[in-house]
């Protein structure tokens, strides 16, 4: 089996993984005040948050290019590939997953699967990494898909946003609820539900209590089994490092890493947002 792995630029990937010849990353363009950017090409994460703060309206992200995906899939057979696996951002935040399902049976001599990851950002990047590890240890395509299904079902992220007004602009919270929330110092904890949709998990008074609750949730959720935990932030590195230290102090093991939200999730949640993602080691 020669396996090609696809993902999109919403995945948080290490420089080492990005250099692999059998990895194909589809760009997700972001439009900020009429200018189009692609993160990692002509836009860094830091620049994105700077531009978003100065923009007259929220940035808009597009779906990855189906034409580009088709072009690469068409070329795979002559490169000796026999299988292709696409791990893209959750169907709960993008229509791309639904829009490409017709392609699975369109390429003769190529076995293709596009599972719904129900997640994005750093956990999505770790899924990609896991697939390469399983392939390298000799797993066949069916076994990789089975392990991936287990991993997807036990992966999520819990999120605390810094600015409720940003959720209003994105249509995730009413203006009245945001005004009341700001007055009462309410910090809603959001999460990726089992449909891969970002929704409110619970509401907590004050950031300090919300941070403590985030840690409790992750500790409860990852109590059985081995997990990788990632602190993901929207241009808030100091807050993220502080939370990482809290997690280590609470005994969540040594495998707690840091990552940044890119433009896709950053647009939804705003600067200062912070999340705890978790994914099982299989």
UniProtKB/Swiss-Prot annotation:
It holds the Pfam family DegV. Keywords: Lipid-binding. Hexadecanoate binds at residues 61, 94. PROSITE patterns: DEGV (PS51482). Residues 3-280 form the DegV domain. One of its GO terms (molecular function) is lipid binding. Disulfide bonds: none annotated. May bind long-chain fatty acids, such as palmitate, and may play a role in lipid transport or fatty acid metabolism. This is DegV domain-containing protein SP_1557. It comes from Streptococcus pneumoniae serotype 4 (strain ATCC BAA-334 / TIGR4).
């Amino acid at each position: 089996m020669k396996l090609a792995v696809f993902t999109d630029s919403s995945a948080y990937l290490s420089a080492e993984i990005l250099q692999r010849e059998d990895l194909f990353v589809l760009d997700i363009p972001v439009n900020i005040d009429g200018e189009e950017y692609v993160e990692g090409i002509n836009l860094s994460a830091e620049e994105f948050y700077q531009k978003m703060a100065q923009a007259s309206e929220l940035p808009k992200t597009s779906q990855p290019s189906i034409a580009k995906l088709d072009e690469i899939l068409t070329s795979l057979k002559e490169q000796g590939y026999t299988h292709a696996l696409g791990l893209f951002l959750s169907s709960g935040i993008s229509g791309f997953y639904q829009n490409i399902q017709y392609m699975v049976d369109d390429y003769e001599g190529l076995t293709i699967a596009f599972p719904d990851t129900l997640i994005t950002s750093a956990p999505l990047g770790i899924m990609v990494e896991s697939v390469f590890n399983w392939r390298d240890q000799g797993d066949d395509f069916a076994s990789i898909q089975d392990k991936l299904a287990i991993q997807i079902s036990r992966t999520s992220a819990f999120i605390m946003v810094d600015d409720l007004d940003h959720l209003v602009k994105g249509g995730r919270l009413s203006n009245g609820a945001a005004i009341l929330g700001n007055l009462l110092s309410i910090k809603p904890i959001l999460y990726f539900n089992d449909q891969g949709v970002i929704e409110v998990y619970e509401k907590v008074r004050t950031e300090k209590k919300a941070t403590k609750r985030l840690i409790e949730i992750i500790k409860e959720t990852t109590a059985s089994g081995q997990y990788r935990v990632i602190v993901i932030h929207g241009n808030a590195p100091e807050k993220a490092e502080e939370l990482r230290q809290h997690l280590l102090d609470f005994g969540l093991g040594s495998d707690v890493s840091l990552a940044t939200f890119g433009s896709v999730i950053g647009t939804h949640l705003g600067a200062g947002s912070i999340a705890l993602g978790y994914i099982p080691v299989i």
